[in-house]
Amino acid sequence: MEGSDFLLAGVLFLFAAVAAVPLASRLGIGAVLGYLLAGIAIGPWGLGFISDVDEILHFSELGVVFLMFIIGLELNPSKLWQLRRSIFGVGAAQVLLSAALLAGLLMLTDFAWQAAVVGGIGLAMSSTAMALQLMREKGMNRSESGQLGFSVLLFQDLAVIPALALVPLLAGSADEHFDWMKIGIKVLAFVGMLIGGRYLLRPVFRFIAASGVREVFTAATLLLVLGSALFMDALGLSMALGTFIAGVLLAESEYRHELETAIDPFKGLLLGLFFISVGMSLNLGVLYTHLLWVVISVVVLVAVKILVLYLLARLYGVRSSERMQFAGVLSQGGEFAFVLFSTASSQRLFQGDQMALLLVTVTLSMMTTPLLMKLVDKWLSRQFNGPEEEDEKPWVNDDKPQVIVVGFGRFGQVIGRLLMANKMRITVLERDISAVNLMRKYGYKVYYGDATQVDLLRSAGAEAAESIVITCNEPEDTMKLVEICQQHFPHLHILARARGRVEAHELLQAGVTQFSRETFSSALELGRKTLVTLGMHPHQAQRAQLHFRRLDMRMLRELIPMHADTVQISRAREARRELEEIFQREMQQERRQLDGWDEFE
């Protein structure tokens, strides 16, 4: 691809994303499906703006690579060890059972048994990019089904290596004996990467961070991700697996959040490029000539994988309310099929249009997943948002709650329990199905679903409520919900949870003045108790706590328009000096008041 053509392709991709994704969100079909439809529109079977699909698809796999690095950062080795049973138990069972069933079905058609085995393995894999994206959108990350889904995807990445090695054996083109020297070198190189990463990465990043130049840190992060991907590719292993390991090695480092921030914009853009490329690769010619075969294949593929995944989830002990989410989000074919089927085609395992038919089936199955998950959400909404049983006595006796609480995790539960104890009429919106089921058993008015959907807010009584308390885990969800409430329900008093100072600044900029930083108050209280244990009188410690709170809030408001680190640091130093002066001025006055203060500790 020439330089000018590459630039034109980049402009087209950006235009497709900017046009398709907001339209898809407006239609309620999700960003992933919007990317896929945009790819079909600009690809060789649509308007024909871009024809070199294979090269772009290979480049766009970097989106998956960046995504796996961020996932690795969220796990540490001890947590990964805890998942070993689900990775090598459920993950292995899913691949083997799905591959066996799908290979058997392919053998009933014109596929030779060797081609059927390769086809079954390729179709058994799921799309890491799509599944993880949808799990994040649906709030499945911290749920039992989300953890199990990640374990299955991780095993599928590990299965890439033996699957690719199996192709030449099935084609009869493998060497009579293995080159044990070459295999040994690859194993040593892989072990060397693990050891080197374990002991060298932190000192290297510490040295880079000492320069104080953010751009250099970002460049080093990109070098780490791309370098580990290329290194694993040279060993014949999965690039995504390499970056995942690099992320795990840095999961417990002090640079974890900075690394995540540096990578996140690249991950989002490249993931969008990946989905657009998948849409471009859809061969509409094969779809037109073999329409019935393709439709039946897609239905059978999705049905077989859902059946296998649902049964495994049941055997593993996943709650019944989460099994369909787990099965649905992994029901599609994956990006690995493109690599495996291309390798098999080069070994002449496929005949005629067999490879094209399989790839069309995989692509269309990926397009069904967002729609399938919407159907699952609707089914769950009907199941959990229906009327209460006759023997239940809900806190809300009518459809006019005083308060809507969004999220009922550790933070939201404290607020909800306080309101319930004071007989306030509340409605809770929660995305964790098991929590919804439990709370409805106790008679609480709970709705399952995404609170950023205006229709759900209306159903929950937002038009009649006085206040809404937002306790979402993700800051993006919080800000989106604030915007929706301000636009559609301007009468609501908005109270929100902020995870830290950055989120507090964003809330203040959005006009939300009633918020609470989740660790600030508890940290202040513990600090007050620490002052008392060090000999300070309880009255003086209480005043110190109040002064600190007021000054910190004033700083927070003053620094809203300022985001430069140097300004923040400079103002923080001034505030510390100001706080010390306040305490010194009040020392004598505090001593006079000590006699009138009763110790309460």
Swiss-Prot record:
Gene symbol of the encoding locus: kefB
Superkingdom field: Bacteria
Pfam family, one: TrkA_N
Name of the protein: Glutathione-regulated potassium-efflux system protein KefB
NCBIfam families given in the database record: 2a37 (TIGR00932), PRK03659.1 (NF002973)
Quaternary structure (record): Interacts with the regulatory subunit KefG.
InterPro entries: Cation/H_exchanger_TM (IPR006153), K/H_exchanger (IPR004771), K_H_efflux_KefB (IPR020884), Na+/solute_symporter_sf (IPR038770), NAD(P)-bd_dom_sf (IPR036291), RCK_N (IPR003148)
Keywords attached to this entry: Antiport, Cell inner membrane, Cell membrane, Ion transport, Membrane, Potassium, Potassium transport, Transmembrane, Transmembrane helix, Transport
Source organism of this protein record: Escherichia coli (strain ATCC 8739 / DSM 1576 / NBRC 3972 / NCIMB 8545 / WDCM 00012 / Crooks)
